[in-house]
């Protein structure tokens, strides 16, 4: 088959640098996905390979240049996750036009100056819902950014003085363990369950700032059982791993919503750790609440996974095993 070389001009070297990413990540990713070679010479990208693949890769480079020119968050380079997503869009025959809008959207900027925002079309829908809904449900597999983006939205609301505090909670029923049967005092017992929430907070705020906010009770992390009997006003409240809440716990949690507050419920319906035969409160809510004004449901899928590519393949393999009729 005939090999050709296609020249794609870069508007300027800064745009070319942003497109190439850290350590030429973009070039290496595109070369791995499509059998072509890419070089940057005299302000032009040279794409070489078999005609069909070279044209496809050149078209993709052109679209990526448009995305970068359209204004990346904080003028940062394309990340590997951004490029993987754009590659999937291009390989699926979809335009990356919407990516321009998505990749310039910043939900919050971390203490270290890193802009945080959506990285897939599903995440963009989720971020939009987080901004406008009083109560938002995000349902989807691991790695889709459900928890991280919810915590980012909470930090943004706190910084903008839209809420006075952040409350993060999880049901303490994982891997068949219940708090009462675990050794140690309460803090030691609940800490491992809530660790992912701490991790997200420490990533968005620095350790020192987060510690001060915990001390002043501006941020509170507690097991779901500790929400009973409270009315949560002027707060951004997140229920994480909601698939492990019972129907009664879910109803109890949702009715804690107070004035000036917002609630986000995240979980993966396929991963429940509840005893066999007990319906997940998240599943029940997804059946009962759609259509209620003020409540938004966002469903994220494997195409929204922004972790390692292998995580996406693992999710696809399990999906295929559990739902063979869909494949």
Give residue ranges: language-model regions.
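Flexible hinge/switch segments at interdomain interfaces of large molecular machines
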Residues: 1-4, 101-105
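Conserved adenine-nucleotide phosphate-binding loops and their immediately adjacent elements
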Residues: 103-115
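Interdomain "pre-motor" coupling segment immediately N-terminal to P-loop NTPase/helicase cores
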Residues: 39-103
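Conserved helicase motor core of SF1/SF2 NTP-dependent helicases
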Residues: 44, 112-121, 132-239, 243-327
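Short glycine-/aliphatic-rich beta-strand segments at the starts of folded cytosolic domains
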Residues: 1-18
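Compact, well-ordered interaction domains used in eukaryotic information-processing assemblies
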Residues: 28, 32-43
């Amino acid at each position: 088959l005939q090999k050709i070389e296609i020249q794609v001009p870069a508007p300027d070297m800064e745009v070319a640098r942003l497109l190439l990413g850290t350590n030429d990540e973009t070039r290496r990713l595109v070369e791995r996905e499509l059998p072509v070679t890419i070089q940057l010479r005299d302000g032009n990208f040279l794409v070489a390979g078999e005609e069909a693949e070279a044209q496809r890769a050149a078209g993709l480079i052109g679209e990526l240049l448009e995305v970068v020119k359209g204004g990346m968050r904080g003028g940062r380079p394309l990340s590997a996750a951004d490029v993987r997503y754009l590659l999937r869009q291009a390989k699926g025959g979809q335009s990356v036009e919407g990516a321009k809008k998505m990749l310039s959207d910043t939900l919050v900027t971390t203490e270290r100056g890193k802009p945080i925002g959506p990285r897939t079309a599903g995440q963009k829908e989720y971020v939009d819902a987080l901004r406008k809904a009083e109560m938002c449900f995000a349902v989807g597999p691991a790695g889709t950014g459900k928890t991280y983006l919810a915590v980012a939205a909470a930090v943004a609301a706190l910084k903008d003085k839209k809420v006075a505090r952040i409350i993060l909670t999880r049901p303490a029923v994982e891997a068949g363990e219940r708090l009462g049967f675990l050794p140690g005092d309460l803090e030691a017992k609940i800490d491992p369950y809530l660790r992912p929430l701490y991790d997200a907070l420490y990533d968005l705020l620095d350790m020192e700032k987060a510690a001060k906010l915990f001390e002043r009770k501006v941020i509170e992390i507690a097991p779901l059982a500790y929400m009973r009997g409270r009315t949560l006003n002027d707060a951004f409240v997140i229920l994480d791993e909601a698939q492990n809440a019972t129907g009664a716990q879910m109803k109890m949690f949702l009715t804690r919503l107070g004035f000036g507050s917002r609630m986000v419920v995240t979980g993966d319906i396929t991963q429940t750790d509840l005893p066999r035969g007990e319906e997940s409160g998240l599943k029940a809510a997804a059946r009962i609440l759609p259509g209620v004004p003020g409540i938004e449901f966002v469903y994220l899928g494997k195409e929204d996974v922004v972790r390692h590519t292998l995580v996406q393949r693992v999710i696809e393999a399990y999906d295929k095993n559990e739902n063979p009729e869909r494949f």
